[in-house]
Design a protein with these regions (language model features):
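Conserved metal-binding segment of the jelly-roll/cupin
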Residues: 89-105
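Short conserved catalytic/interaction loops centered on acidic-Pro-aromatic/His motifs
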Residues: 79-83, 108-113
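Signature of the catalytic double-stranded beta-helix
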Residues: 1-44, 50-56
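Short His-Asn-centered micro-motif
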Residues: 46-49, 72-73, 84, 99-102, ...
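Histidine-centered active-site/metal-ligand motif
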Residues: 47, 52, 61, 104-106
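Extracellular structured ligand-interaction cores
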Residues: 30-33, 41-43, 65-69, 76, ...
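A short beta-strand-loop-beta hairpin characteristic of the jelly-roll/cupin
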Residues: 65-92
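A short hydrophobic beta-strand segment most commonly corresponding to one strand
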Residues: 66-71, 96-98, 112-129
Length: 130
């Protein structure tokens, strides 16, 4: 097995234009993007992201840093996501989760097909709350 956490395609690479539209619809600004592929048996145990590079590059303080995870395809058996101790399954393509930088989260894939998501890191636009 090549990896325990999955494969990433991040903002250092060309991004499709739609990622900016998605970020605006969610209410995020000063955004960084990562497409994430989680193969069968990839796991990401419960953790809190550090966001040091994002916060340095964009000049954003941690208390203003948020992460959105957009599900690129409908849920498939064996795909799992958890944020703040609450598990999520049965999602539809386009649904998303949004959480503050200090919130623990986890993911795993024990299914027979890859799981694809888009991670967007950013600040909430003025007046937006979760």
């Amino acid at each position: 097995h090549k990896s325990f956490s999955g494969g990433m395609y991040d903002s250092r690479q060309p991004m499709p234009d739609f990622v900016h539209t998605v970020a605006q619809q969610i209410g995020l600004t000063n955004t960084g993007y990562v497409f994430y592929k989680m193969d069968t048996l990839d796991i990401m145990p419960t953790h809190v992201d550090h966001f040091e590079t994002y916060e340095r590059v964009f000049g954003v303080e941690r208390n203003n840093t948020y992460r959105a995870l957009i599900f690129m395809e409908d849920w498939k058996p064996g795909h799992y996501f958890e944020v703040a101790g609450v598990g999520k399954t049965n999602w539809k393509a386009g649904e998303y989760a949004l959480w503050h930088a200090d919130v623990p989260h986890a993911a795993s894939n024990i299914g027979s097909s890859s799981r694809y998501t888009l991670q967007i890191t950013g600040e909430l636009v003025d007046g937006k709350s979760i």
